[in-house]
Structure formats: C-alpha cells, structure tokens
Amino acid sequence: QIRILASNTPYDAFEFNGNGGVKIAWTPLLRDISGFYHFCVAVDTTQSTNTNRVKFWLNGVQVTTTSTANWMSQDADLQVNNTTEHQIGELRYNASTELDGYMADMVLLDGTATDYSSFAEFKNNVLVPKNPSGLSFGTNGVHLKFASGALGADSSGNSNTYTLNNIDADHSSIDTPSSGAGS
C-alpha cells in the first residue's frame, strides 16, 4: 500500500508498505493541505541496490531521505498487480480511514518503472499532468481519470475498471490541477 500519513498537520510522511514487513517512509512535509501535489512511486524489485527498488518523487523532485527503510528483497513478488483487491483512497483493511482530498489522475503501469516525467511536466513553471496514453500499461496497468460519470473507468485500453464503493458521480469536481497552467 502507498499512503500519506497525517498524524498531524503538516502531513508528516509518505509511506510504502509491502508484504513481509517491507516499509519505507519518506518525510517531506506537506504544508499546504489545500494545494495540488503530484506523487510518483516507481517500484522495480529486480534492482540489485535496495534503495533503487522503490523510488518516490514529490512534485517532480526525487525524495531520498527516509525515516524508516525496511527494503524488500531483490525480485520480491508484491501484492500490487497481483490477484488481490486494490483500493484507492482508503486504507486497506480499514474502511474508516478514507482520503479526505481529491485525485485528478491515477496511472498504474504493470512491468514498467519510470520517473515522474512520464506523467507530469512543467508548463509556465507549474507542474501539470501529462497525457499518459502513449505509455505501455502492461497487462494489469490502469489509467483512472476520475471523470464525471465514469469515476472508476480505465482509460488505459486494458478495461481494468474499478468498482466504486460508497461513492457517486457527484463526488467529482470539474476543477483540475492543470486549470490555468496553459496548454
């Protein structure tokens, strides 16, 4: 699971948890709780150097300082993109811990680990989402645009549509992180 820890404000950690006690926590402070943040996590368990197996970018800058680092073993088989339930905006196994925020776009690539520049770019000194349609999504990859009326619809071409639970189309907003950033 990938999650933002908010034990206080500013948010105090961004965490990756995997099976077998894997836990990596980065500690960038997210001071503006109303601002747009772009998170990118790349996982490649085939890497021989443990710190290269999970990488994290916040707003286009790689974060390398960790408060906790229990890395997975090389070639570890993780739950993401396996036959397990995937949840977005909710802490797995704890339905009372839900995201209190907005998501503009979510891309999950299967079999490819890449940095933030595949998903976002700077326009007029503002980080905005890029169209990921040219990326290789792999078999289990997904692109969720969270568009009104189709919040769980997959736009990757894989038809990996997510089932909504306790959410309706009226939970969407027409505002986007790219509003006003130019084209």
What do these predicted ranges mean?
Residues 77-103:
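Extracellular glycan-interaction patches encoded by glycine-rich segments
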